[in-house]
Curated annotation (Swiss-Prot):
Gene Ontology BP annotations: mitochondrial genome maintenance; mRNA processing
SUPFAM superfamilies named among the record's database cross-references: RNA-binding domain, RBD (SSF54928)
UniProt name for this protein: Mitochondrial escape protein 2
Organism for this UniProt entry: Lodderomyces elongisporus (strain ATCC 11503 / CBS 2605 / JCM 1781 / NBRC 1676 / NRRL YB-4239) (Yeast)
GO cellular component entries: mitochondrial inner membrane
Topological domains, Mitochondrial intermembrane: 304-862
Keywords for the protein's UniProt record, in alphabetical order: Coiled coil, Membrane, Mitochondrion, Mitochondrion inner membrane, mRNA processing, RNA-binding, Transit peptide, Transmembrane, Transmembrane helix
Top-rank taxon: Eukaryota
C-alpha cells in the first residue's frame, strides 16, 4: 500500500486528546496542528486536470479549505434495508434539496459570517456530510459547539409532547451530528450498513482499550475483537456503526504512524428455526405442514363460509337490502337521475331518426323481450295444471315439520321450473334463502379436480385451490421417501367433498342463527321500554325456527339419481343424502329433492330410515295445454296444422320446446315432427337394440326384451306388470325389476307403483310411442329384430329341453317315477312344438317382403 504524504493540515480535536492516555500520541506540545492526507489525493489531482465535474459525489473525496469544517449529520436509526437499496435509484437532486432544507432547519441560526458551503446526501446511510465555512474570529471548536446547541434545541422542540416522545422511544429519528476526524470515502457500492465494522491498519494496530475510547462516543458497543492485522467492533445499533465509519475512516494516529480504514462487515446471524428444521427434518416438516394447514383453515374457511351464505341469500337480495342504506341513497339517487336523463335523451334522438328514416324499432324491442315472454307463456300454461301441487309444496314448507320433500316426474317434465320458478321464487318469503344443487354436474365430472371445482361452484365455496391437491400428493410422496412416513397432507376426494359440505352446513347454521339473533335483539330492545309484567318472552332457537320457517334456507337438490355417470363418483349421491338428512335432523333447513330415477329413493331411505317422505308426482301436460303453449310461442291462430303434430309430442316440455325451435328455424310442422320421430327412433335402435354399454354394470337388458316391450307399447298405452312376467323373456325376479328400473332411468319406459309395488309400465316419453311405431313399420328393421327375438325364444326352449332330457336320464335310472316321466314327456313335446313353430315363423319372416303382418301366435303377444 502506498505510504502517506503530508499535503495539508487540520486542527486536532482536543476532546480526543483528553479521552486517550498521553503516551499514545507521539506529538510535541508545541505542535498545534496534525497533518494527514493520502496518495489518493495525488491520484485525484492528476485525474482532475481534464475533468469539469470534480465534486465529491463523482470522485468520492471531499475537498476542504481553510476556515472550513466538515460535519456528519445522522437523521434516523433506520434498519429498512429495502429502502436503503431502492434509495440508490431515486433522483439525487430531489433528495438532496430535501436534506439541505432539513440541515438548515436543525442547524440555523448559524454564527455570524458563517455559511453552509456544501451538503452531500448519503441516502443509503440516512445521513449527510455538511461542510461549513465559519468566521475567522471563531475557533472550530466554538463553531461546532454552536451547531450542536442548535440541533439539541431542535430535537427538544420536536419531541416536546408525550406522543412524539413515545414514537421517538420506539423509532429514534432525532438528528445527531459528529465531527469528521478522518478522510471520508464517499462511495455508493452495494455494501449496506451493518452493526459490525472491520478496522484495518496502515502501521501499528490499536489495542482493545484504544478502540473503545475511539469509538464509544458514537454509540453503545457490544463487543470488540482485536487481531494482528484487523479488528472488529460490534455496535448496538446500525446508526452508531454508520457514524463511526464516516467520521473515523482515514484518520491518522501516533504521529502518522497508524492510519485507520473502516468497512462494514455483514453480521451472520444464526436462525434457530431454520437450524432446527434442517437438524430435525422428520419432526419439523410434519409440524410445519400442520401449521400451514391450520393457518389456511383459519384464514380461508370464514371467507368460504361467507361466500356460501352469499350464494344462498343470492346477490340480488343482498343488494336490495344494501339499497336501504342512507349513504348509498345519497350516491345512487343522483346517479340514477343522471342515467335516466341520458337515456331519455338517447330515446328522443332515436325517435327523431326513426321519423326521418321511416324505420320502426318495435320489432327489435319484441325480439329483445322474446325470452321473457316465452317464460311467461310457459308459466301461464302449466301453472294452472300444477297450481294445487305448488300450493301443497308451499304448505309443507310453512308447516315446518321435517321438511323432506321429494318431487318425482319423468325427464323433461319441468320439475326444476316447478320447484324453483313457480313455487319458491314466486313467494316473497321463500325466495330469500334458496340453494340449488345440480347433481348431474357432479356426477359427470371426469377428474378429481373437476369434481372439486363443480362442487365448489354449486355450493358457492370460494376460494378453492384445485392445484393444491396435486401439490399435496407430490409433497406427501416426497416426504414419504425422505422421512419414511406420510405427512397426511393429501386427502381423498371423498374427504374433500365431505369437508366442503360440512362447511356448507356451518354456513346454513350461521344464517339461521343470524335471524334468531336479530329477533332476540329486537325483543330485548322492546322489553327495555316495557314494564316487567308486559315484557315479551324470548323464544328459544327451536321455537323460533318452528314459528318462522322462512328463516331456514331451502336446499333444492335437482336431478338426484341412483348412480353417477362416472363410476368413481358414485359416492356423491349417498353423501348428499346423508348431508341432507343431517340438515333435517338438526332442523336448520328445508330440503327438496327432484328426481326422475325412482331407484334413487333407496339412498334417502338409507339416510333417514325412520322418516316418512312427502312426495309430489309431476306428469306431462295435457294436450290442450300443450297446444295452447305452442300457439302462443309461435303466435299462431290457425291450429289445424298443429293437430296432427301435438299428439306424438304429448305434454313433455322438453319435446315441446324442441318442436318450437325447429318451427322457428324455418321447418314445416309436419317435417319437424317427422324429424323428431326419426331422431328418437335412431336413438332407440342405437342405444337399446344394439346392446350399447352405458357403464360397466348398467346395460342389464337384452335387446329382445326391449323389442318385445316396444311392440306391446306400440299397441296399447299401458302394460300390466303381471302380464309381462308371464312372457318367456321375463319372469318374476330381481333381474326383471333391475332391467325395468334401468330402462326407466334412461327414459325408455315409465313405471307406476301402487303402495310401493310395481303395477304398470308406460312409455317413458310420449314421443317414443311414435318412434316405436316408426321402427316397427320399417320392414327391414322389423325382420331383423323380430328374427332375433324368435331366435332368443328358440334358445330358451332349447335350454328347457336340455334340462328336461337330463332329468329324464336321471329318472330312468331310478325306474320308479312314472308320473314324473309322463310330465316331462309332455313338457318336451310342448317345447319341441314351440321350436317348430318359431322356426316356421322365422322362415316366413325371411320370405316376407311387404308390410309387417299382424300375427296371432299361441303366446297371445301379437
Amino acid at each position: 500500500m502506498m505510504r502517506l504524504k503530508i499535503l495539508r493540515a487540520s486542527r486536532i480535536n482536543p476532546a480526543l486528546l483528553r479521552l486517550r492516555p498521553p503516551h499514545l500520541y507521539s506529538i510535541n506540545k508545541s505542535q498545534a496542528f496534525r497533518f494527514y492526507a493520502t496518495d489518493i489525493e495525488d491520484l485525484k489531482r492528476q485525474s482532475d486536470r481534464t475533468e469539469s465535474d470534480n465534486s465529491a459525489s463523482t470522485t468520492g473525496v471531499i475537498d476542504k479549505e481553510a476556515n472550513e469544517v466538515l460535519l456528519y449529520y445522522s437523521f434516523s436509526n433506520s434498519r429498512n434495508f429495502v429502502k436503503q437499496y431502492i434509495s440508490r435509484f431515486l433522483p439525487s437532486k430531489f433528495l438532496g434539496e430535501q436534506v439541505e432544507e432539513k440541515v438548515k432547519d436543525v442547524s440555523y441560526p448559524l454564527p455570524q459570517n458563517s455559511s453552509i458551503t456544501e451538503v452531500l446526501h448519503l441516502p443509503r446511510d440516512s445521513g449527510a456530510f455538511v461542510k461549513f465555512k465559519y468566521s475567522p474570529s471563531l475557533t472550530a471548536k466554538e463553531f461546532i459547539q454552536d451547531i450542536r446547541s442548535n440541533i439539541a434545541e431542535s430535537n427538544t422542540k420536536r419531541y416536546s409532547n408525550i406522543f412524539m416522545k413515545a414514537i421517538g422511544f420506539v423509532w429514534d429519528r432525532s438528528t445527531q451530528v459528529y465531527t469528521v476526524k478522518g478522510v471520508p470515502w464517499i462511495e455508493d457500492l452495494k455494501r449496506f450498513p451493518s452493526q459490525k465494522i472491520g478496522i484495518t491498519y496502515e502501521g501499528n494496530p490499536l489495542t482493545e482499550e484504544e478502540l473503545y475510547v475511539l469509538f464509544r462516543r458514537y454509540g453503545l458497543i457490544d463487543d470488540i475483537k482485536v487481531e494482528s492485522t484487523q479488528s472488529f467492533v460490534l455496535f448496538d445499533t446500525v446508526r452508531a456503526a454508520i457514524c463511526a465509519k464516516h467520521c473515523i475512516t482515514g484518520m491518522q494516529l501516533n504521529g502518522g504512524k497508524t492510519t485507520i480504514h473502516i468497512q462494514y462487515v455483514p453480521v451472520k446471524k444464526t436462525n434457530f428455526i431454520i437450524e432446527m428444521i434442517s437438524s430435525h427434518t422428520k419432526i419439523a416438516l410434519p409440524i410445519i405442514l400442520a401449521l400451514l394447514a391450520t393457518f389456511a383453515v383459519l384464514i380461508f374457511d370464514p371467507i368460504r363460509e361467507w361466500f356460501i351464505q352469499l350464494k344462498i341469500t343470492r346477490a340480488s337480495h343482498s343488494f336490495d337490502e344494501f339499497k336501504e342504506n342512507k349513504w348509498f341513497k345519497i350516491v345512487y339517487i343522483p346517479y340514477k337521475q343522471l342515467l335516466n336523463a341520458v337515456s331519455s335523451g338517447y330515446d328522443y334522438i332515436d325517435t327523431q331518426l326513426h321519423e326521418v328514416t321511416g324505420i320502426n324499432n318495435v320489432d327489435e324491442c319484441l325480439d329483445d323481450n322474446q325470452v321473457l315472454q316465452e317464460k311467461n307463456w310457459e308459466s301461464n300454461m302449466f301453472w294452472r295444471e300444477r297450481f294445487e301441487k305448488a300450493k301443497q309444496l308451499k304448505l309443507w314448507i310453512m308447516e315446518n315439520i321435517d321438511t323432506f320433500i321429494i318431487v318425482k316426474g319423468p325427464q323433461g317434465s319441468g320439475k326444476e321450473e316447478f320447484v324453483v320458478d313457480h313455487t319458491l321464487m314466486a313467494d316473497a318469503k321463500l325466495r330469500k334463502k334458496v340453494l340449488l344443487l345440480e347433481c348431474d354436474e357432479l356426477s359427470k365430472a371426469r377428474s378429481e379436480n373437476s369434481l372439486i371445482a363443480s362442487t365448489a361452484s354449486q355450493l358457492g365455496y370460494f376460494p378453492v385451490f384445485t392445484w393444491t391437491n396435486s401439490i399435496s400428493q407430490f409433497i406427501d410422496l416426497g416426504l414419504q421417501g425422505l422421512t419414511g412416513q406420510k405427512s397426511g397432507l393429501s386427502e381423498s376426494k371423498e374427504t374433500q367433498i365431505k369437508n366442503m359440505f360440512s362447511l356448507a352446513t356451518q354456513a346454513i347454521r350461521s344464517l339461521t342463527d343470524g335471524d334468531y339473533n336479530k329477533y332476540k335483539t329486537n325483543i330485548e330492545k322492546k322489553n327495555r321500554r316495557l314494564k316487567d309484567d308486559e315484557k315479551i318472552e324470548v323464544l328459544r332457537l327451536e321455537e323460533f325456527l318452528a314459528q318462522h320457517p322462512e328463516s331456514k334456507p331451502i336446499i333444492v337438490i335437482n336431478k338426484f339419481a341412483r348412480k353417477a355417470d362416472v363410476l368413481s363418483n358414485d359416492f356423491i349421491f349417498p353423501l348428499i343424502a346423508d348431508w341432507a338428512s343431517g340438515l333435517i335432523q338438526n332442523n336448520i333447513a328445508h330440503v327438496v329433492f327432484t328426481t326422475a330415477d325412482v331407484g334413487s329413493l333407496q339412498h334417502l331411505n338409507d339416510a333417514l330410515p325412520n322418516q316418512v317422505f312427502k312426495n309430489i308426482s309431476l306428469s306431462d301436460a295435457s294436450i290442450a295445454s300443450s297446444k295452447q303453449y305452442i300457439c302462443d310461442a309461435l303466435k299462431m291462430k290457425d291450429t289445424a296444422t298443429l293437430d296432427d303434430c301435438i299428439a306424438p309430442l304429448g305434454g313433455r316440455m322438453l319435446d315441446l320446446q324442441a318442436f318450437i325451435r325447429r318451427i322457428k328455424s324455418g321447418e314445416d310442422p309436419l317435417q319437424a315432427i317427422d324429424e323428431m320421430v326419426n331422431q328418437a327412433a335412431e336413438l332407440i335402435t342405437t342405444f337399446f337394440l344394439h346392446e350399447h354399454k352405458f357403464s360397466n354394470d348398467d346395460s342389464n337388458w337384452n335387446p329382445s326384451q326391449v323389442w318385445l316391450i316396444m311392440k306391446l307399447l306400440s299397441k296399447k298405452d299401458v302394460i300390466d306388470y303381471d302380464s309381462l312376467i308371464k312372457l318367456p323373456l321375463f319372469k318374476q325376479s330381481k333381474e326383471t325389476l333391475d332391467t325395468l328400473s334401468t330402462l326407466e332411468k334412461y327414459d325408455l319406459v315409465s313405471l307406476k307403483r301402487e303402495k310401493g309395488v310395481l303395477s304398470k309400465i308406460l312409455t317413458g316419453r310420449p314421443l317414443f310411442t311414435a318412434a316405436f311405431e316408426n321402427i316397427i313399420s320399417d320392414v327391414r328393421i322389423w325382420k331383423l329384430y323380430e328374427t332375433q327375438y324368435l331366435l332368443n325364444l328358440v334358445s330358451l326352449e332349447v335350454q328347457k329341453l336340455t334340462k328336461f332330457e337330463n332329468e329324464l336320464t336321471t329318472i330312468y335310472k331310478i325306474n320308479k317315477l312314472d308320473g314324473r316321466i309322463d310330465y316331462l314327456s309332455k313338457k318336451i313335446d310342448e317345447s319341441n312344438q314351440k321350436i317348430v313353430d318359431y322356426e316356421k315363423e322365422i322362415k316366413d319372416i325371411a320370405a316376407y317382403k311387404g308390410e309387417p303382418k299382424q300375427r296371432h301366435s299361441f303366446l297371445g303377444i301379437f
